[in-house]
């Protein structure tokens, strides 16, 4: 991570940290690094956004910056992040830009870039943009007169993306009753249209954005209302998306949450059965549940773990030519179809498995036994010392011996805060909590803020 770019683009409180001035510079410098210096006089750039009230302000500034470098900008309007990634690739654009802070509160916003291949930027590309941001007045081209180009609206891009998604499944969803939660974000109109077009009987919540209510007690980070609605309407299942549509969480017919691990298992199992799973491998992060790995083992499916963050999952998938990966939080990447986590794509693939197998979501998810998990955050003076602390290693070894293979420990420094995260999975809730507390107590005693 650099001074401006985090793990998922540039983010901050809109108009305070992520200002229109910064958005202009990101458009100008990002457009130069990623498009103009390839030799294109008028590189094509696609720009999309979510439903946040600050989106229009940042969009205007960003587009001004892009046009100032000579870019030909096509404004997509409200669309999902994976929609921008797909269209950038499909339409042969040099660059795609999404204005969104994903599952964050409405006050935040962000800007993330996609290269012409539909993938997020490399560290090297981000560093090149950051170097320009830190210069006072970098000498860059400034077209004048007839060399300045108009921007255009391409709102039908969303429909093009939905038509593509529809083509990835071989069945319709007639007879399935599905509740959709759009998080009052990018998928608020996309999801009902897509599932309706596939002949599902749909109910919706969180699909009435007003610019201020994105992710507010709805969507994939707040699936409680969805669970209630599924049970109340006697629906087959529910799907909750996040603000920019790159992640998904499901709810079964009984109102039970089905997370990213379970969704990956269900889809991966079907792909494996149909000999469509590259190298019989699913890529996940270290936060995936132990039950996920045990279930995969029983199916003869291999797994590969990365650091937390969908960008690391994608990097590993590209390295090994794997076509399914994701996170427990609901970022699921299906590389045969798109280059980033895609909630709508994952949702219709999951619905397709349910329709084709004739099994309920609870039956499919029940094949993976989730181990109870306890997570404790400990505030420390130097979070990176945890990896070499002898006392912490000692208590971890002791707990592992006691669990005798029926559990898992993960102790890691937080990526964003001065914390050590202690996560334990065990056979029972009581064991998970007890073991996590034992380890957290040692971390606190040896590394806490008062040390």
Curated annotation (Swiss-Prot):
Gene Ontology cellular component list: cytosol
Q: Using the UniProt record, name the top-level EC class of this enzyme in a single word.
A: isomerase
Its EC number is 5.4.2.10
Q: Name a GO molecular-function annotation.
A: magnesium ion binding
**What's the PTM story here?**
Activated by phosphorylation.
InterPro entries with a match to the protein in the record: A-D-PHexomutase_a/b/a-I, A-D-PHexomutase_a/b/a-I/II/III, A-D-PHexomutase_a/b/a-II, A-D-PHexomutase_a/b/a-III, A-D-PHexomutase_C, A-D-PHexomutase_C_sf, A-D-PHexomutase_CS, Alpha-D-phosphohexomutase_SF
Where Mg(2+) binds, per the record, is at 102, 242, 244, 246
- Protein name stated in the entry: Phosphoglucosamine mutase
Native organism is Staphylococcus aureus (strain bovine RF122 / ET3-1)
